[in-house]
Amino acid sequence: MNLSIVILAAGAGTRMKSKTPKVLHTLCGREMLYYVIKEAKKLSDDVSVVLFHESEMVKKSIEKYFSDIRYVIQDHVNYPGTGGALMGIEPKYQKILVLNGDMPLVEAEELKQFLRAGSDFVMSVLDLEDGSGYGRVVIHGGSVERIVEEKDATGEEKSLGTVNAGVYLFDRALLACYLPRLKNDNAQKEFYLTDVVEMARKDRLIVAPLFVKEENFKGVNSKADLAEAEAIMTGRIRRRWMREGVRMRLPETIYIDEGVKFVGECFIENGVSITGDSYIEESHIKAHSVIEESRVIRSDVGPMAHLRPQCEVTETHIGNFVEVKKSKLTGVKAGHLSYLGDCEVDEGSNIGAGVITCNYDGKKKHLTKIGKNVFVGSDSQLVAPVSIEDDSIIGAGSTITKNVKSGELALSRAKQENIAGFFARYFSSSK
């Protein structure tokens, strides 16, 4: 598609009340700017991002996902404002679509409407029940007549619900004509892109209004806005995967990050959270389980289990209240109340209730290796570094500090002693 896209991402976003640049705040595990670029690249091979505030931090974050984006650093000293942001761009194509980096819900399909409008100047417009807080868009004879800031609006203009959504399509020649003529004679001393509307109308050009969906063009300016946008985004993610065949019970209670991938027939129960770039294949994730940056293949997890980052679980049963961290489990049963951290457990092994791998010595983490067909009895502690070889047994209640060889039974608890008649003697002596 012969279209250049410019994404404005230079602002600090002071209303977010954060040291993090606004466009790097995340929803569903990805930065806001990531979503805008992803949709832009569906339409164009010429995408530029205008930066200023913490520009190197923004570039470093986005380069993880996209390698072919052009970055333009705005001259914020001499040319501040949205109009100034466009003064340093070098578009490849005749049509230029201007987007905002704080609109993570924008979708490529709706952006195609700007091209279908058939005008050299198209401006996005929202039709709201209450336009309070926005500049009003006055439309006359099928063209945008002017944009009036709320403080300057008449009573009649304030009653309008038509407001500027902040996305524009320009012809390159039109932009080249008007950008040099922008002035900053306003209270903020900034160059406003919206002033191009008035210039174009004075030259009797049509500024075509394009009415768009509020949900898709919602700007994120505060933490409250971010929460609303994330709720919408996670709903889209859930619906996308359900269309692909993933079954979800009470989907509105399930949280899934953008980077998560499902393969085959999966069943996700209510209250589940799956984050990072987790990979779930042919598996059943039961209620209220949490999976972070892990791989689950042909397994069942939960209910109320927790897979922390860097777990790989294959053909394994992970039961309730089992926590696994940075571990590889293949063909394993760990049914209840266990902590398995920094360990490798091979097929056929059974981890009893209350088993803990003691992986941290106060300075660094150590590995626990458990071989094939190992039975680890309940309430055992495996003090790493330690290796339990194939076909061995750990007696319940043991604390294992030494390696266990294949075929051995390991016990480390005091011998039980039963004292006859003790109950009667004990309680009679207290009377």
Curated annotation (Swiss-Prot):
It is an enzyme of class 2 (transferase). It is found in: Cytoplasm. PROSITE patterns: HEXAPEP_TRANSFERASES. UDP-N-acetyl-alpha-D-glucosamine binds at residues 8-11, 22, 74, 81-82, 135, 149, 164, 221, 308, 325, 339, 350. Its main location: cytoplasm. Keywords: Acyltransferase, Cell shape, Cell wall biogenesis/degradation, Cytoplasm, Magnesium, Metal-binding, Multifunctional enzyme, Nucleotidyltransferase, Peptidoglycan synthesis, Repeat, Transferase. InterPro entries: Bifunctional_GlmU, GlmU-like, GlmU_C_LbH, Hexapep, Hexapep_transf_CS, MobA-like_NTP_Trfase, Nucleotide-diphossugar_trans, Trimer_LpxA-like_sf. Mg(2+) binds at D102, N221. Homotrimer. Catalyzes the last two sequential reactions in the de novo biosynthetic pathway for UDP-N-acetylglucosamine (UDP-GlcNAc). The C-terminal domain catalyzes the transfer of acetyl group from acetyl coenzyme A to glucosamine-1-phosphate (GlcN-1-P) to produce N-acetylglucosamine-1-phosphate (GlcNAc-1-P), which is converted into UDP-GlcNAc by the transfer of uridine 5-monophosphate (from uridine 5-triphosphate), a reaction catalyzed by the N-terminal domain. This is Bifunctional protein GlmU. The gene is glmU.
